[in-house]
Each structure stands twice: as structure tokens, then as C-alpha cells.
């Protein structure tokens, strides 16, 4: 019968190897993949609200939105269609998050308008300024789970404000 002699340096080597293997299987908190602020927006949303025209009259509005989050939630493609009795909008845009600062471009096909937007993202709230050649507005959006509240203010334009509540479908 053969006897095995394990020397202390062999035990140390085996223990070190086991520790390395076990530690390599544990997640490292500092290196975990973090999702960007747009990650939870993906999907189809719909709802309604109110359009306030420059004349002071109010109209009910119905909207549908589609958000496509990309690049681990740091890029967003969006499409928004809204209609009221006298107002239609077909808005498309792309947004990029960089450390809580948002920039992007937009195009609205009904009025053939285009421009850019920039703003900030803090938690579940986005605040932005939207600009085009003939249009400027302040935009805010708060998302909580499957519900979203959206506000757009554009003093001096034909549509002075839009408020709406959307729900993920």
C-alpha cells in the first residue's frame, strides 16, 4: 500500500486554489452592470390628457408612445402620437444619457419640424428643454412603475401646454 505524504506547502497551494475559485464565482459589487435611466421605460404606453391652446381653450387628447431602450438603458428611441379635435402630433426622437445629462434630436412629421433637446435625469424624473427653428418648450416626465405623467409648456406658441398621464400596456 502506498502512502501519500502531503507537505504543508501542498496544503497551502490547494487552499489558495480553492479560495481563488470560490472568489472568482462571487459578484463584485463595484463591477456590477448598472442599467441606465431609460431601461425601465421600454414598451408601449397609452393614455390621455389635456391640450391648452393659446386661445385659452382646452381639448382632450389621446396619446400612444413607444420607447425602445438601448445600450444598457443609456440610449432611447421614442415615438409619440397624439390627437385631439384640432391638434395632431407625430413625434420621433432619440436620446442619450451621459451621467444624468440627456441630449437628443427630434422630428415632428405633422408640422415638418425638427430640433434638439437637452436636460437632466434625476431618479424617476426627466426635465428637458426642447428647441427647434420655430418652437421651444419645457418638458418634464415622471415615471413610477407602469405610470407616467408628462407635462409640456410652450408659452407663446399655438399649443401653450399639454399634460397627460400614460400607462404601460
Where are these regions (language model features)?
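Bacterial N-terminal signal peptides
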Residues: 12-27
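N-terminal helix-cap/turn-to-beta initiation motif at the start of protein domains
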Residues: 31-46, 71, 96, 140-143, ...
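Edge beta-strand at a domain terminus
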Residues: 30, 112-113, 138-169
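N-terminal secretory signal peptides that target proteins for export/translocation
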Residues: 1-9
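Contiguous, well-ordered beta-strand patches that form the walls/edges
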Residues: 82-134
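Short, hydrophobic/aromatic-rich segments at coil-to-beta transitions
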Residues: 42-46, 71-79, 99-105, 121-129, ...
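Hydrophobic/aromatic beta-strand elements that line small-molecule binding cavities or substrate pockets
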Residues: 62-68, 91-95, 116-119, 137-143, ...
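N-terminal glycine/threonine-rich, aromatic-flanked beta-hairpin/loop signature
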Residues: 57-99
